[in-house]
C-alpha cells in the first residue's frame, strides 16, 4: 500500500501554501504591484504597468503549456520549472515573435519569471530551482534597445513644418513633442503631468516617473515659448492643457496620457509622410535625439545625464546614436 503523506490532509493554509502553483504566485506578485505606491512629484502613483507585465507573463505561460505540452498551466508547481521547460519556453516565444515580426521580449519575460522564483523562495515555497536559469545568463541581461534618435536635419524639418497644414489640436501635439525635445527628452507622462511648482527660475526640477532619477532641465528659449503659448489654456496647476479633471483615478490618468501619446505619434507620422521622412519618429525619439545632439555638440556626458535624468552609462547604452555618420567619416579619413 502507498504511504499516505501526513500533510496531504493538512488544512493549515500557511502549510499548503508551500506547494502553491506558479500561476498563483505570479498573480500574488501582480496584486502586490497593483497596491504598491510610489511618491513622485507630489503625487502618489501605483505600479500598474509592472503588474500588467506579470499578468501578461501568466497569459504567455498558459498559452505556452497548452500549445507545447497540452497541459493546463494551473497544474504547474515550481518543481516543474526546469531548465528544459525554460528552453522550450524561450524557443516558443522566439518562433511566435518571428511570425509577428517582433522580438517577443525574451529577456523581459525570463527576468520576470526569475523574479517570481526569487519571491517564491523568500516566501518559503518548496522546490524552487534557481539553477534552472543558469544557462540563460546572456538572455537575462537587459536587452540593449536600438536608439530611436534621428538626425538634427530631420528634427529641423519637423520644427519648421508648415503649421497651416495642421489642425489646432495637431499643432498642440507637435508642441508637446518639441517641448520634450527641448527639455531633456522628457517622457510623455512627465510632460503631461508637469506642474508649475516644478519650474524653479529657468529650470524644471522633477523626479522621473519611470525611474528613481531626478532631472534638472535648463529651460531654453524655445521651451519657454511653448510654455507661454499654453499658459491661459492649462487647467489647475498644470503647465499644459493635458489633464482636465481635478482628481482623476490613476487608471484614467494613465489612459489620458496614453491617448495623448498616440495622438502625438499620429501627428508626427502625418508630418513625416508630408516631408517624405523615412525615419520612424515617435514621442520617444525626442529623448535620444536630444541626448545625441548634446553629446555631438561637445557637452560633457555628466552634464547631459543631469539634464536628462539618467546615468552616463545608460545614455551611451540606450540613447546615444551617431547623428552624422558622413561628418564622422570625413574626420576619420583626416585622422587616418
What are these regions (language model features)?
Residues 30-49, 58-145, 161-164:
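N-terminal core-binding DNA-recognition domain of tyrosine recombinases/integrases
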Residues 166-168, 233, 265-306:
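Short, basic (Lys/Arg/His-rich) helix/loop patches that form interaction surfaces
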Residues 197-205, 278-279, 299-318:
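Short, polar N-cap/turn motifs at the start of nucleic acid-interacting alpha helices
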Residues 1-28, 32, 40-43:
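N-terminal helical hairpins
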Residues 135, 193-229:
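Conserved tyrosine-mediated DNA breakage-rejoining catalytic core shared by Y-recombinases
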Residues 155, 220-278:
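Active-site/catalytic core of tyrosine-dependent DNA strand-transfer enzymes
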Residues 208-212, 246, 308-333:
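Catalytic-site neighborhood detector that most strongly recognizes the C-terminal catalytic loop/helix
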Residues 107, 132-188, 192:
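Basic, Lys/Arg- and aromatic-enriched nucleic-acid-binding interface segment
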